[in-house]
């Protein structure tokens, strides 16, 4: 089994790359907003109930997938590398898969802010992430998260791990998925 964690800044293309990777592998996509959009109509994103439900739902999903006969899972996440709670969450989910003897692959995407602002309003993104339909709020959130957090690693930070960092500013999602598939033999 393979567990592919695709991470990077807001609107870098994680879900779209995950969709393309799902098409060319036997892996299933579980993108970040699959849980967010289900719970958001009931609880504000900043509320303790929202955070608890999203986290618990994801953990249960990962536990079930890890003990299943699925080939693996692709998970997308805006990992705030300077956030201890985000790092703890990633460690928790990675441990679930490592205990199941899965191969964990880290795929880090980076792209220019200008390109990400364009992607932030792409039809594919808006189709699967209705909470992003308020363009002004979504753009403000993108820029604010960029300002407040570290969203891409420094060179060498992921030594000793299956890690691939791709600048996809000028690469389409299909090509990025091919690179990932080749690099990790998926």
What spans do the regions from the language model cover?
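Small-molecule kinase domains that catalyze NTP-dependent phosphoryl transfer to phosphate-bearing small molecules
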Residues: 122-175
């Amino acid at each position: 089994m393979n567990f592919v964690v695709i991470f990077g800044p807001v609107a870098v293309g994680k879900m779209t790359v995950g969709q393309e990777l799902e098409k060319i592998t036997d892996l299933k996509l579980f993108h970040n907003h699959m849980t967010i959009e289900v719970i958001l109509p009931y609880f504000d994103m900043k509320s303790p109930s929202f955070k608890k439900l999203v986290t618990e739902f994801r953990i249960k999903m990962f536990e079930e997938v890890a003990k299943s006969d699925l080939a693996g899972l692709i998970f997308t996440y805006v990992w705030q590398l300077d956030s201890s709670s985000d790092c703890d969450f990633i460690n928790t989910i990675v441990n679930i898969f490592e205990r199941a003897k899965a191969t964990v692959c880290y795929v880090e995407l980076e792209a220019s802010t200008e390109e990400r602002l364009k992607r932030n309003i792409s039809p594919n993104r808006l189709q699967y992430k209705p909470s992003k339909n308020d363009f002004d709020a979504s753009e403000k959130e993108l820029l604010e998260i960029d300002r407040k957090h570290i969203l891409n690693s420094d060179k060498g930070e992921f030594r000793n791990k299956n890690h691939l960092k791709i600048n996809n500013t000028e690469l389409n999602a299909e090509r990025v998925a091919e690179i990932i598939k080749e690099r990790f033999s998926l």
